[in-house]
Amino acid sequence: MDISIRSIQQDELSALLDLYKHLNPTDAPLPDTSTLEKIWNEILSDRKINCFVADWEGNLIASCILVIVPNLTRGARPYGLIENVITHPDYRRQGVGKCLIHHALQFAWGHNCYKVMLLSGRQTKEVLQFYEKAGFKKDIKTGFVATPISD
């Protein structure tokens, strides 16, 4: 399988949203097209936000977002946050996600990040092992998540 890992292109919003259907199948409905396009343009124009995709024969089969956050500690080195990691179910367990995460980490290291953090909502043994094999350690820090009361 010849897969290309690259930054997403502006005209690939629809393909990304199709892929995201496998991320959180019970997600809230999306807003109208004009709102989506506004958010999409905001994401694409922010140099701190990097959306990487795995492309196989013109199809987006995996994606993740890496946000690089400027920082005034740790020698003023930035840190990274990875979110929305998804591989299409038909392409899981084939090394696609591993290549994608590796690409995101190399990008972060190339931008002098002193660490990259990731939270996973899935706690299955396979998912946790996937992230550990990709270089993440689960026992260095404790993660907390707050959500609005209305959610």
What spans do the regions from the language model cover?
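Short coil/turn motifs at secondary-structure junctions
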Residues: 69-71, 90, 123, 149
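Conserved GNAT acetyl-CoA-binding A-motif
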Residues: 101, 108-120
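Residue-level recognition of the GNAT/N-acetyltransferase active site
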Residues: 9, 88, 121
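Conserved acetyl-CoA-binding loop-helix of GNAT-fold acetyltransferases
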Residues: 87, 93-106, 133
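Short beta-strand-to-coil "C-cap" segments at the C-terminal boundary of structured domains/repeats
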Residues: 145-151
